[in-house]
From Swiss-Prot:
Family to which the UniProt record says this protein belongs: Belongs to the class-III pyridoxal-phosphate-dependent aminotransferase family. Putrescine aminotransferase subfamily.
Annotated source species: Escherichia coli O9:H4 (strain HS)
Protein's UniProt keywords contain Protease: no
Residues carrying N6-(pyridoxal phosphate)lysine: K300
Catalyzed reaction equations: an alkane-alpha,omega-diamine + 2-oxoglutarate = an omega-aminoaldehyde + L-glutamate; putrescine + 2-oxoglutarate = 1-pyrroline + L-glutamate + H2O; cadaverine + 2-oxoglutarate = 5-aminopentanal + L-glutamate
Entry cofactors: pyridoxal 5'-phosphate
NCBIfam families reported in the protein's UniProt record: PRK11522.1 (NF008570), putres_am_tran (TIGR03372)
Binding-site positions, pyridoxal 5'-phosphate: G150, T151, Q274, T332
Protein name, UniProt field: Putrescine aminotransferase
Signal peptide: none
UniProt keyword annotations, A-Z: Aminotransferase, Pyridoxal phosphate, Transferase
Keyword Transmembrane helix: no
GN (gene name): patA
Length: 459
């Protein structure tokens, strides 16, 4: 039977939510009621699949914690008052920590003046953020398009490359196996996981995938495309594959791809949605090899964990195809004042506190600890790898990876798997994680592995 709309029900629900937003604390009964509500509404109105996923990686199979608030810069607190060290970082959102006071203050100050712009008059913060990114990014990157997410930044990059290369008769894109660039139609065409692609086939034509890190495969693909007249418009890459399982290419790979792009007249698009903003020990991962892309995609941590924002930054030569008609590709909320305020504050914090260098130092410490554990538990752990504060522990099979996430949850450390590699648990904490918290994470991982070994031996 069709359900009739109910204004009264919607009003009551929204009023209840607003009351919850105003609260700073909950008593025991309120916590229990909220947990029941959230699970019920996820099941009935969001997506029950999320509940089953959380249940599979949570101690006791209780669907896991219901988030209530950030604790410190580096922790989360659930409705039961339990505090978790965040080693997931919202999949790379919280580079400057949770509720960073500088970022929150900037957004609050802007909110008091003007949350959204008129769309017609010139908005100052968009101009200032574009100027800041032009100064911050490598090479000749100069002009920025702002949006609301990583997949949108990739969509803009693909459209920009098409607009630039179409008059030159170049329409093909080369991406890599294991890549993740988002799930909107264009970005999904570059993404390389069949689970996400098959339900939406056919995707956009003209995309090819080659093995990541294999420069000869890249050269062969570019050559074949040239011979068949399918000339390549752009190569799109992640400097390190995040969702693919934190896969690092061989040293010199990005440099070699840059040279091939120049040789074949293809643009180089670097997707730094996850690796950017200091995550790998440099402001941008491409700086480890001094590689300068034609188009750079940013999002996630750009908003400081406070506001969603993405950016597509390009050279003047490429971006100029939009000069005659700046309305060819736009978005209503992209570059809004609140998001730009958050991004400007985030960049300021990253530079003032030298967080990229901290990411390198603390990342080395964590990775050394995880590699030691891999040596101690070779029956469970296949490898620990990473760069800066983007790390992964790969287990011998999928089930062990899920069990590790569950045991870490029991130790009050939040971790999760990767979308394209189920055996791999990603470690992606805020760059503000303290040395003491790094030590606690390593201790928690050791306890988790010890408990898992006992379980295996008893089975």
């Amino acid at each position: 039977m069709n359900r009739l709309p109910s204004s009264a029900s919607a009003l009551a629900c929204s009023a209840h939510a607003l009351n919850l937003i105003e609260k700073r604390t909950l008593d025991h009964e309120e916590m229990k009621a909220l947990n029941r509500e959230v699970i019920k509404y996820f099941k009935e109105h969001v997506n029950p699949g999320f509940l089953e996923y959380r249940k599979s990686v949570t101690a006791g199979g209780d669907y896991g914690a219901v988030e209530w608030q950030a604790g410190s810069l580096n922790t989360l607190v659930d409705t039961q008052g339990q505090e978790f060290i965040d080693c997931l970082g919202g999949f790379g959102i919280f580079n400057v920590g949770h509720r960073n006071p500088v970022v929150v203050s900037a957004v609050q100050n802007q909110l008091a003046k003007q949350p959204l712009h008129s769309q017609e008059l010139l908005d100052p913060l968009r101009a200032m953020l574009a100027k800041t990114l032009a100064a911050l990014t490598p090479g000749k990157l100069k002009y920025s398009f702002f949006c609301n997410s990583g997949t949108e930044s990739v969509e803009a990059a693909l459209k920009l490359a098409k607009a630039y290369q179409s008059p030159r008769g170049k329409f093909t894109f080369i991406a890599t196996s294991g890549a993740f660039h988002g799930k909107s139609l264009g970005a999904l065409s570059a993404t390389a996981k069949s689970t996400f692609r098959k339900p939406f086939m056919p995707l956009l034509p003209g995309f090819r995938h080659v093995p990541f890190g294999n420069i000869e495969a890249m050269r062969t693909a570019l050559n074949e495309c040239k011979k068949t007249g399918d000339d390549v418009a752009a190569v799109i890459l992640e400097p390190i594959q995040g969702e693919g399982g934190v896969i690092l290419p061989p040293p010199g790979y990005l440099t070699a791809v840059r040279k091939l792009c120049d040789e074949f007249g293809a643009l180089m698009i670097l997707d730094e949605v996850q690796t950017g903003m200091g995550r790998t020990g440099k402001m941008f991962a491409c700086e480890h090899e001094n590689v300068q892309p034609d188009i750079l995609c940013l999002a996630k941590a750009l908003g400081g964990g406070v506001m969603p924002i993405g950016a597509t930054i390009a050279t003047e030569e490429v971006f100029s195809v939009l000069f005659d008609n700046p309305f060819l590709h736009t978005t209503t909320f992209g570059g809004n004042p609140l998001a730009c305020a958050a991004a400007l504050a985030t960049i300021n914090v990253l530079l003032e506190q030298n967080l990229p260098a901290q990411a390198e130092q603390k990342g080395d410490m964590l990775l050394d600890g995880f590699r030691q554990l891999a040596r101690e538990y070779p029956d469970l752990v296949q490898e620990a790898r990473g760069k800066g504060m983007l790390m992964a522990i790969e287990f011998v099979d999928n089930e062990i990876g899920y069990n590790f996430a569950s045991e870490m949850f029991r130790q009050r450390v939040l971790v999760a798997g990767t979308l394209n590699n189920a055996k791999t648990i990603r470690i992606e904490p805020p760059l503000t994680l303290t040395i003491e918290q790094c030590e606690l994470v390593i201790k928690a991982a050791r306890k988790a592995l010890a408990a898992m070994r006992v379980s295996v031996e008893e089975a």
